[in-house]
C-alpha cells in the first residue's frame, strides 16, 4: 500500500539493507547489502531498538504474549489478573503505581538479592505488593500463556502475566558510526541524542522512532516522528537552496 501511494511522487525506492553510511561533501552516501551506493543530501535513520531480555529460561518464548514490556499495549487484556513485575530497583514505586491502574494483584520479583530501599519496600508493603526475592529459575507456559514463575528454593508462583522493563540497545550502529552521541543515563539511556524535530548533532542527519530521544516507544509515535523529521529535512534542503546565488547550481539528489 505504501509503495502504491508513493507512485505519483518523485520518489526512488531501493530494496536492501543498509550496511554502511558515511558523510560526504554535500550530504551522505549509503551502501546497500547488494553493493549499490546511494547519495543523498539529508539522511533519516529509523533503525529502532532491540530489547535486551533477562536470560531466564522460558521468558523469550512468552515475550510479547504474556511477558510484556508495555502496559498500555497489553494492560487491558490482563486487567484484574495476577501480575508479576521485574524492573530496576529505583523504579519499583513508579512501576507499581502505573500497573495498579490495571490490577491490584502485584508481585515484585528481584531476580536475586534485593536492592530495593527500605523506604520503597515500606511503600510497596503498604499497598499489598508482594516482594519475592531470589533468582528466577524458569518460566512455565502453555502456548502463549504464562502459567507459573519458578524461583530458586523451589518456590512456584502462579501468575498470568510478567511485566519486564529490560534494557534497550540500538538495533544498528549506523548513528554512532556517523558521529552521533547516545543518551547515557536515565530511562532514555541508549537512544540517539536529537532535538524535538529529530535533528542530531551531525549536520543533515535525522533520527526517528524508538532509536530517537525525541519521542516515546510506540508505533504511533514513531510514525509521527518520521513525518516531523521528513518535514524538517525537506525544509533544510529548501533553505539551503534559497541561499544559493541566483542561477547557481542546485542539487536535487
Which residues fall in each region the model found?
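A Rossmann-like FAD-binding core segment of flavoenzymes
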Residues: 3-24, 30-32, 37-38, 101-190, ...
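FAD-binding core/adjacent interface of flavoenzyme oxidoreductases
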Residues: 13-81, 161, 192-197
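Short, well-ordered coil/turn residues at beta-beta hairpins
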Residues: 40, 46-48, 53-55, 86, ...
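FAD-site-proximal beta/loop scaffold in flavoenzymes
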Residues: 61-77, 168-216, 235
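Cofactor-binding loop segments of dinucleotide-utilizing enzymes, especially the Rossmann-like FAD-
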Residues: 72, 88, 111-113, 210
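Rossmann-like NAD(P)H-binding beta-loop-alpha module
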Residues: 81-102
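A conserved FAD-binding loop/helix module that cradles the flavin
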Residues: 93-95, 208-253
Amino acid at each position: 500500500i505504501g509503495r502504491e501511494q508513493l507512485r505519483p511522487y518523485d520518489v526512488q525506492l531501493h530494496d536492501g539493507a543498509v550496511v554502511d553510511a558515511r558523510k560526504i561533501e554535500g550530504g551522505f552516501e549509503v551502501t546497500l547489502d547488494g553493493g549499490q551506493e546511494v547519495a543523498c543530501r539529508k539522511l533519516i535513520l529509523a533503525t529502532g531498538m532491540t530489547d535486551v531480555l533477562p536470560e531466564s529460561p522460558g521468558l523469550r518464548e512468552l515475550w510479547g504474549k504474556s511477558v510484556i514490556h508495555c502496559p498500555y499495549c497489553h494492560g487491558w487484556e490482563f486487567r484484574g489478573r495476577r501480575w508479576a513485575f521485574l524492573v530496576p530497583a529505583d523504579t519499583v514505586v513508579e512501576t507499581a503505581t502505573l500497573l495498579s491502574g490495571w490490577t491490584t494483584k502485584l508481585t515484585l520479583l528481584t531476580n536475586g538479592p534485593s536492592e530495593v530501599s527500605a523506604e520503597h519496600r515500606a511503600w510497596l508493603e503498604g499497598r499489598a505488593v508482594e516482594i519475592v526475592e531470589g533468582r528466577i529459575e524458569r518460566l512455565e507456559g502453555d502456548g502463549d500463556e504464562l502459567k507459573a514463575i519458578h524461583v530458586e528454593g523451589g518456590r512456584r508462583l502462579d501468575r498470568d502475566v510478567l511485566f519486564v522493563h529490560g534494557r534497550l540497545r540500538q538495533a544498528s550502529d549506523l548513528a554512532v558510526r556517523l558521529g552521533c552521541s547516545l543518551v547515557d543515563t536515565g530511562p532514555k539511556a541508549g537512544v540517539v541524542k536529537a532535538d524535538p524535530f529529530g535533528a542530531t548533532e551531525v549536520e543533515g542527519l535525522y533520527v526517528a522512532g524508538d532509536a530517537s530521544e525525541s519521542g516515546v516507544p510506540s508505533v504511533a509515535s514513531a510514525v509521527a516522528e518520521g513525518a516531523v523529521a521528513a518535514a524538517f529535512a525537506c525544509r533544510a534542503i529548501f533553505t539551503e537552496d534559497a541561499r544559493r546565488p541566483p542561477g547557481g547550481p542546485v542539487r536535487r539528489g
